[in-house]
């Protein structure tokens, strides 16, 4: 990998606070691009618009989804934009390339009864269960990203309000309140688990060895809980984020408030995460439409 590409990835990690999974996607996109350059005998510095079009055609020839192609092109466009700030002689060959439209989809979320099933599955009488419950409670109660969760420190938790301060994308801080269930879960965790596992750090969530938990560790915890939960077949951290937003909207929260809680700069971004369930749509329809209910 070229040195400027390594500098680019370092910038994304340090300055933009990208998660390890996002960084891996950027890294893999650059590696694939470099392989294309080598195969076609092209140079990074002299790569042109016509070459960018050929690369786009190459990606589509691999039967990739439009969403994946869009991300890969976005990675390269962002990389060249960064390179231009370091070298005035560089031109971005992807700036005029027509961006493939992303496929639209409704984000998956858990129904309230499914969330209750998850909480019931978590063991409550051992250290691992106490820790696992805090992870799920925080992700569901606040809608934070896993990259934000694993970086929460003890000083970031306010048990009086209660709420938590997190460092989001672009190193932007925000405060998210949480409810009594989450507060009690954290309180028990701090009393019975965390102090005994604390090493030379002040991170809130730790693994069973007492070290700060990783994103991979959080995903392992979630998958383990799902395997033992009847009626729940799939989970990923962002699904809990979708669930957080969906449940708030279903209970009447306004979009601007949800935007602030999620840490989104643009309201349009929040729209991708927040949608109402079919049950909620029917409930609103039945209550609002004058001819929705027969005989009334």
From Swiss-Prot:
It is found in: Cytoplasm. PROSITE patterns: CB, TYR_RECOMBINASE. Keywords: Cell cycle, Cell division, Chromosome partition, Cytoplasm, DNA integration, DNA recombination, DNA-binding. One of its GO terms (cellular component) is cytoplasm. Its main location: cytoplasm. GO terms for biological process: cell division; chromosome segregation; DNA transposition. It comes from the Bacteria. GO terms for molecular function: DNA binding; tyrosine-based site-specific recombinase activity. It holds the Pfam family Phage_integrase. SUPFAM superfamilies: DNA breaking-rejoining enzymes, lambda integrase-like, N-terminal domain. The active site is at residues 145, 169, 238, 241, 264, 273. InterPro entries: CB (IPR044068), DNA_brk_join_enz (IPR011010), Integrase-like_cat_sf (IPR013762), Integrase_catalytic (IPR002104), Integrase_recombinase_N (IPR010998), Integrase_SAM-like_N (IPR004107), Recomb_XerC (IPR011931), Tyrosine_recombinase_XerC/XerD (IPR023009). Residues 105-286 form the Tyr recombinase domain. Residues 1-84 form the Core-binding (CB) domain. NCBIfam families: PRK00283.1, recomb_XerA_Arch, recomb_XerC. Belongs to the 'phage' integrase family. XerC subfamily. Site-specific tyrosine recombinase, which acts by catalyzing the cutting and rejoining of the recombining DNA molecules. The XerC-XerD complex is essential to convert dimers of the bacterial chromosome into monomers to permit their segregation at cell division. It also contributes to the segregational stability of plasmids. Forms a cyclic heterotetrameric complex composed of two molecules of XerC and two molecules of XerD. PANTHER family: PHAGE INTEGRASE-RELATED, TYROSINE RECOMBINASE XERC. This is Tyrosine recombinase XerC. The gene is xerC.
């Amino acid at each position: 990998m070229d040195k400027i590409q390594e500098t680019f990835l370092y910038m994304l990690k340090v300055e933009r606070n990208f998660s390890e999974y996002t960084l891996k996607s950027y890294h893999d996109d650059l590696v694939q691009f470099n392989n294309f350059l080598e195969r076609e005998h092209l140079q990074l510095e002299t790569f042109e618009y016509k070459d960018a079009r050929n690369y786009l055609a190459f990606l589509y020839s691999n039967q990739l989804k439009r969403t994946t192609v869009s991300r890969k092109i976005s990675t390269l466009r962002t990389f060249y934009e960064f390179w231009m700030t370091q070298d005035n002689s560089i031109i971005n060959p992807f700036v005029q390339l027509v961006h493939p439209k992303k496929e639209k989809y409704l984000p998956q979320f858990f129904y309230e009864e499914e969330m209750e099933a998850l909480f019931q599955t978590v063991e409550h009488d051992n250290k691992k269960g106490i820790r696992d419950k805090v992870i799920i409670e925080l992700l569901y109660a606040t809608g934070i990203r896993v990259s934000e969760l694993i970086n929460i420190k003890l000083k970031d938790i306010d048990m009086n309000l209660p709420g938590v301060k997190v460092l989001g994308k672009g190193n932007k801080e925000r405060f998210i309140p949480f409810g009594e269930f989450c507060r009690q879960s954290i309180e028990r965790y701090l009393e019975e688990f965390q102090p005994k596992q604390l090493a030379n750090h002040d991170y809130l969530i730790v693994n069973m060895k007492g070290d700060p938990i990783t994103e991979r560790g959080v995903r392992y915890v979630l998958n383990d809980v799902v395997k033992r939960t009847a009626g729940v077949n799939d989970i990923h951290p962002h699904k809990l984020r979708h669930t957080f937003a969906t449940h708030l909207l279903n209970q009447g929260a306004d979009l601007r408030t949800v935007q602030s809680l999620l840490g989104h700069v643009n309201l349009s971004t929040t729209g991708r995460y927040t949608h109402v369930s079919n049950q909620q749509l029917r409930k609103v329809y039945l209550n609002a439409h004058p001819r929705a209910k027969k005989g009334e």
